[in-house]
């Protein structure tokens, strides 16, 4: 396992953490993975479980996860067409990581939200030009 060196730019992903974030990072991918951990889902099921995601964004995120081998898309030749998504073996290997993220969020959510509420808004911080 390579050590994470923030100044190492020799390889695109010199740090395994950066690579993992590239695969499952962003606002939606970890939520998609979390919901697929409980079993196979159709597109609209995932959409209902993550109501703030747009149809276009869900399509893009599912496609990226499929390209990376994290999820499997099964297309059934039916009318109307039926498509189901499930975790691959590689995707299932992320379950402990996603579960750890869930646990961390459950433990620390309240404290972080309190800190955010008490933070000084960025727009009210003095800058050199406002003095």
Regions found by a protein language model. Give the residues of each.
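Beta-hairpin "wing" of winged helix-turn-helix
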Residues: 66-86
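Residues within the DNA-recognition helix of helix-turn-helix
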Residues: 61
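C-terminal regulatory/oligomerization modules of transcriptional regulators
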Residues: 1-12, 67, 72, 89-131
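N-terminal helix-turn-helix DNA-binding core of bacterial DNA-binding proteins
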Residues: 8-57, 77-78, 84, 115
């Amino acid at each position: 396992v390579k050590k994470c060196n923030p100044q190492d730019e020799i390889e695109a992903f010199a740090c395994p953490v950066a690579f993992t974030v590239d695969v499952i990072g962003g606002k939606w991918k970890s939520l998609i993975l979390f919901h697929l951990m409980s079993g196979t889902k159709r597109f609209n099921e995932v959409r209902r479980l993550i109501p703030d995601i747009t149809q276009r964004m869900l399509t893009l995120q599912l496609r990226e996860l499929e390209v990376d081998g994290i999820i499997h898309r099964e297309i059934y030749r039916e009318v109307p067409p039926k498509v189901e998504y499930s975790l691959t073996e590689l995707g299932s290997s992320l379950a402990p990581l996603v579960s750890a993220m869930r646990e961390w969020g459950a433990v620390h959510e309240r404290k972080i939200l309190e800190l955010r509420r008490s933070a000084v808004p960025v727009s009210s911080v003095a800058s050199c030009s406002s003095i």
